[in-house]
UniProtKB/Swiss-Prot annotation:
Chain spans, region Interaction with KDM5B: 168-189
Gene for this chain: PAX9
Segments for region (RED subdomain): 82-130
Domain of life: Eukaryota
Renumbered residue ranges of the record's region PAI subdomain: 7-63
Designated name of the protein: Paired box protein Pax-9
Listed GO MF terms: DNA-binding transcription factor activity, RNA polymerase II-specific; RNA polymerase II cis-regulatory region sequence-specific DNA binding
Matches recorded under SMART domains: PAX (SM00351)
């Protein structure tokens, strides 16, 4: 009994759209083709479309199968747990191995054959997704094992002082007599000198150079200046009565220990030994300016009653200021005339 659903083709046969042809009809098509019947005659005899007959016969000639479905079926899985295990072993032995080298080793060791060996892209994906995290975790664990233990930093309290390389280096620094020693808890750490530091540019010796110096004493550092008071400096002279001299002596005593290469304050001239500046001559702002001080500046209609032709506003001009240029010119002309005679 034929099914109730289906469609009828041009030849009068019944087929179901989207469903494969039954296996019995497929087998009959192959048998008629082996008897030498043409595909067009098979199509009319079995009432099956010509395209369906041609497709079934072509697939049978290529694969030898009359079953429906994709030719060859789905590809079997190649990334089995055994293959992944061997890939992980190869990667751990040689972290710099490439994917194509792993593929060759899988074939050489007999883990896979040429039909089920994974491709280079599949091996790269396995290394990235499944083995990459494990390799990074292993490197991190090995780094933590070989990492040295952290050294203790500066103690948080000067009462509970713990031994550290910084305090040991600070203990080797000699302390001159008369200067209190610096506690180890606040000692400055030793730093490597830099060629571009301020101390090298200015030519100031660093603390490390002072420690390596053979002399038993070293120049005072910044920490030692805080411990020095005014009692350590010599007092002023008793005969100093003037306040200015007393201040100058205090500055000389205070800055007497200047570093090498810098002049001391005592080498400069004191303010008391300098002569006062001369008082400038008072000149009226209404003075007439001319190209040269000469007698051609005659009287004017607006000349002052008590003034002179050279000073119409009754302002006195010193002779040395007014006629200095004229006198020099006159002396020069007399010397030229005498030499000509």
């Amino acid at each position: 009994m034929e099914p109730a659903f289906g469609e009828v083709n041009q030849l009068g046969g019944v087929f179901v759209n989207g469903r494969p042809l039954p296996n019995a009809i497929r087998l009959r098509i192959v048998e008629l083709a082996q008897l030498g019947i043409r595909p067009c005659d098979i199509s009319r005899q079995l009432r099956v479309s010509h395209g369906c007959v041609s497709k079934i016969l072509a697939r049978y000639n290529e694969t030898g199968s009359i079953l429906p479905g994709a030719i060859g079926g789905s590809k079997p899985r190649v990334t089995t747990p055994t293959v992944v295990k061997h890939i992980r072993t190869y990667k751990q032995r040689d972290p710099g191995i490439f994917a194509w080298e792993i593929r060759d080793r899988l074939l050489a060791d007999g883990v896979c054959d040429k039909y089920n060996v994974p491709s280079v892209s599949s091996i790269s994906r396995i290394l990235r997704n499944k083995i990459g995290n494990l390799a990074q975790q292993g490197h991190y664990d090995s780094y933590k094992q070989h990492q040295p233990a952290p050294q203790p930093a500066l103690p948080y309290n000067h009462i509970y002082s713990y031994p550290s390389p910084i305090t040991a280096a600070a203990a080797k620094v000699p302390t001159p007599p008369g200067v209190p020693a610096i506690p180890g808890s606040v000692a400055m750490p030793r730093t490597w000198p830099s060629s571009h530091s301020v101390t090298d540019i200015l030519g100031i010796r660093s603390i490390t150079d002072q420690v390596n110096d053979s002399s038993p004493y070293h120049s005072p550092k910044v920490e030692e200046w805080s411990s020095l008071g005014r009692n350590n400096f010599p007092a002023a002279a008793p005969h100093a009565v003037n306040g200015l001299e007393k201040g100058a002596l205090e500055q000389e005593a205070k800055y007497g220990q200047a570093p090498n290469g810098l002049p001391a304050v005592s080498s400069f001239v004191s303010a008391s030994s300098m002569a006062p500046y001369p008082t400038p001559a008072q000149v009226s702002p209404y003075m007439t300016y001319s190209a040269a001080p000469s007698g051609y500046v005659a009287g004017h209609g607006w000349q002052h009653a008590g003034g002179t032709p050279l000073s119409p506003h009754n302002c006195d001009i010193p002779a040395s200021l007014a006629f200095k240029g004229m006198q020099a010119a006159r002396e020069g002309s007399h010397s030229v005339t005498a030499s000509a005679l």
